[in-house]
Amino acid sequence: MAKFQAKSQNDAPDDGLKEKMIAVNRVTKVVKGGRILGFAALTVVGDGDGRVGMGKGKSKEVPAAVQKAMEEARRNMTKVSLKNGTIHHNVFGHWGAANVMMAPAPKGTGIIAGGPMRAVFEVMGITDIVAKSHGSSNPYNMVRATMDALNNSTTASEIAAKRGKSVEEIFG
């Protein structure tokens, strides 16, 4: 039989991805004998060039929960098209009671966004953006709403391809 070595939790894969932990919550499961304490971690992972993923992990210990969240974030990565360090056009997204609005910004503006949205933008490589959140400030819902908005963005070439026209005809 082959022997398997246990991978230590400090061995992060060297794949060039940026990782950010957004939140760690203490959670409780109530059972007949009392309460079982655990932890839930929310993380985002990105390559700095438009790919970003989010993950949530739960465990009895914080490091294990963070590790599970990072692994899930790596599995759930999506590609978002960027234009000179910002997005192509205004986009809106929502998840639950969280609503987010994002607008492209000129070079040098920086990331004008709060809380969990800023972490998503930093790991995916956006350098200039203006973003506003309304409604729920729950970190999980805000990250999901941000991902929803980013997935709703399209490029001019994608719109032209859908319409069967050239990019020049679209901008007229």
Swiss-Prot record:
Gene Ontology biological-process annotations: translation
Alphabetized GO MF terms: rRNA binding; structural constituent of ribosome
Domain S5 DRBM span(s) in chain numbering: 17-80
Keywords: Ribonucleoprotein, Ribosomal protein, RNA-binding, rRNA-binding
Subunit structure: Part of the 30S ribosomal subunit. Contacts proteins S4 and S8.
Function per UniProt: With S4 and S12 plays an important role in translational accuracy. Located at the back of the 30S subunit body where it stabilizes the conformation of the head with respect to the body.
NCBIfam families the record matches: rpsE_bact
Protein name: Small ribosomal subunit protein uS5
UniProt organism field: Polaromonas sp. (strain JS666 / ATCC BAA-500)
Species classification: Bacteria, Pseudomonadati, Pseudomonadota, Betaproteobacteria, Burkholderiales
Gene: rpsE
